Amino acid sequence: MWGGTCQKQSWRNSSQTLSSCLISRLDHIVMTVKSIKDTTMFYSKILGMEVTTFKGNRKALCFGDQKLNLHEVGKEFEPKAAHPVPGSLDICLITEVPLEEMVQHLKACEVPIEEGPVPRTGAKGPIMSIYFRDPDRNLIEVSNYIPS
């Protein structure tokens, strides 16, 4: 599969480039949080994510074909990021729910909106986005793709 393109050669010094990406999709992201309980409550109540338990008592938030694995600060699992800290995540989530409904839902749940709706550029084209923060102060962007 690798075709020997990087054999015994530092990737930093390599002039080789691939003709296509080797990665097909994102599977999961690990979030380091202050409180698993507060995080699971927020994401399940506010965004409707499913809380799942795996490998003993580890927790994840599932949505679509993705998940957010949760590590509590100071109790991370190995291997882990070099500097795992709560509040360092900035992610964009796509919803089919109209943003105006999301805005009303967030207001009803007393989640302050930091910005939006505002136009942005998503991975597949123009999006309309709103921004708010979770209990760890991670920046959460929820967006609708703008029909072309």
Curated annotation (Swiss-Prot):
Domain (VOC): residue spans on this chain: 25-145
Taxonomy, superkingdom: Eukaryota
Pfam families linked to this entry: Glyoxalase (PF00903)
InterPro entries: Glyas_Bleomycin-R_OHBP_Dase, Glyas_Fos-R_dOase_dom, GlyoxalaseI/FosfomycinResist, VOC
Family: Belongs to the glyoxalase I family.
Record's protein name: Glyoxalase domain-containing protein 5
Organism: Canis lupus familiaris (Dog)
Gene: GLOD5
